[in-house]
């Protein structure tokens, strides 16, 4: 699915990338792991007919962060969603700042404080600033003990979508 995967270059050097697939997503039963979405080969759950773009991975080289590369990747994803007339973007969002707070609060409390603006998380705050809403916390989403395997469930709704 090349139209849903993006690489940002500085000359011939890859400095950022965003990957995703079109999926069915059940917002009534949101608990899942990234592996559930990817399937065994990483794309087995993809179909051009599915209504949601699931952001499976996104990253920017540390030296290029704060330069608009992440925003550009989100805009490319949104452009893909509009082009294919999908309902929006859904993803599990990492919460790297939680590692500094996990001894004193749950992931749910941490995310609530980030959403309220009481705490800053480099990823979640950035996603909110880019029009995403946080729907909750996914437990066991990734194998990352530094954040107890937790991530956020985020959604961006395509206001240009037409059924």
Name the predicted role of every residue range.
Residues 60, 66-82, 90-91:
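Conserved acetyl-CoA-binding loop-helix of GNAT-fold acetyltransferases
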Residues 72-80, 135-163:
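C-terminal/domain-terminus segments
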Residues 4-18, 33:
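Conserved beta-hairpin
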Residues 11-12, 23, 63, 157-161:
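Short loop segments at secondary-structure junctions
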Residues 18-57, 75, 95-122, 128, ...:
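Conserved acyl-donor/pantetheine-binding loop and adjacent beta-alpha core of acyl/acetyltransferases
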Residues 4-6, 51, 148-154:
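Short beta-strand micro-motifs in enzyme catalytic cores
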């Amino acid at each position: 699915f090349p139209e849903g995967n993006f690489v940002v270059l500085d000359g011939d050097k890859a400095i950022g990338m965003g990957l995703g697939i079109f999926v069915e997503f059940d917002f009534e039963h949101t608990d899942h792991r990234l592996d559930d979405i990817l399937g065994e080969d990483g794309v087995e759950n993809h179909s051009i007919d599915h209504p949601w773009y699931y952001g499976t991975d996104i990253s920017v080289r540390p030296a290029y962060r704060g330069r608009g590369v992440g925003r550009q990747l989100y805009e490319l994803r949104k452009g893909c969603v509009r082009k294919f007339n999908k309902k929006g973007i859904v993803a599990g969002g990492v919460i790297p700042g939680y590692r500094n707070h996990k001894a004193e609060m749950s992931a749910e409390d941490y995310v609530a404080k980030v959403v309220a603006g009481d705490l800053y998380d480099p990823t979640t705050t950035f996603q909110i600033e880019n029009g995403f809403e946080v729907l909750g916390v996914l437990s066991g989403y990734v194998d990352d003990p530094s954040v107890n395997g937790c991530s956020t469930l985020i959604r961006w709704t395509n206001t240009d979508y037409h059924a």
